[in-house]
Amino acid sequence: MPQNPPQDFDPIAYINAPRWQASRLGLDRIRELLARLGDPQNSLRIVHVAGTNGKGSTCAYIANVLQAAGYRVGWFSSPFIERFEERIRVDGKNIGMPDLARVTLQVREHAEQMSAETGDHPTEFELMTAVALLHFAQVGCRVAVLEVGLGGRLDSTNVIAAPDVAVITRIGLDHTDLLGDTIGKIAAEKAGIIKPGSSVVSWPQEPEAAEVVEAAAHAAGCTVAQPDFGELDIAPVRHLDPERIEPGEPSVIRPFTYKGSEYETTLLGSYQPQNAALALEAVSALQRRGWDIPQSAIER
């Protein structure tokens, strides 16, 4: 592994530099950059999550279950809420600044060479994708949970080969200037993460989007699993005894039952149990593929 970076190198400032700021969809640049880095994504099992609403919480649920099951889990998300480092996590912990600087320097070397040799350069999100995948590979992650940044079909996270599971959250109108001005067009972009050999799990979409997702899955030889919200029973929010919780621990939980099993979430939006049910179906898809995920890990 390369030596520690110089103390005056600021990886966040480098990634956020104006030269990288662009929304140019396409996979050629990220493919080239990752090839120069040795294609670190090929060492990872992947859960790929696209959609308009609920991507972050769905990723969180899946990553937490896999970690509880004993997998070393990388999670790449966008955007961050409080700290830039939230975008790259391993086993629930943000990447540290020394690691972020070290890996960014490695990516910088190849990004600069690529720019000089080809006249083209990666975007900020492509740099981040490369940093995340390289870091996950270097620290020995077995699986990466990747949250799509924009769309899906041409998003830099779609540089991967077939994911074990492609998850599509609720689809709505978003980024219509880039993805299309109808639900159907946007659904086609989101469904672009579906590849032959993957399991597919989708939110129960409205008819126009559902038809597109089903068609994409059929073309790839896949079937689509969905959560059954008729088997979801959401209990009232419960406040915990403040004398029995540690500082920093959540004080409120939302219990729910899905398919006869009891769960709880500390994410309190009224829609969170539905996102959790979607994540549970993704975990079930992984179990059907032979992943060792005991029920005790799911209920934690």
Segments (PLM) and residue ranges:
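N-terminal leader/targeting and accessory segments in enzymes
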Residues: 1-53, 57-72, 81-83, 109, ...
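ATP-dependent carboxylate-amine ligase
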Residues: 1-6, 16, 159-162, 184, ...
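ATP-dependent carboxylate-amine ligase catalytic core
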Residues: 21-23, 27, 31-42, 68-161, ...
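Hydrophobic alpha-helical scaffolding
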Residues: 23, 203, 269-272, 291
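Conserved beta-strand scaffold positions in the cores of enzyme catalytic domains, especially
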Residues: 46-48, 73-75, 166, 224-226
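Buried hydrophobic packing segments
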Residues: 62, 66, 129-136, 279-286
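Short glycine/threonine-rich catalytic loop with a Thr-x-Gly-x-Asp
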Residues: 73, 267-280
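Acidic, Mg2+-coordinating active-site environments of NTP-dependent enzymes
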Residues: 114-116, 127, 140-148, 163-257, ...
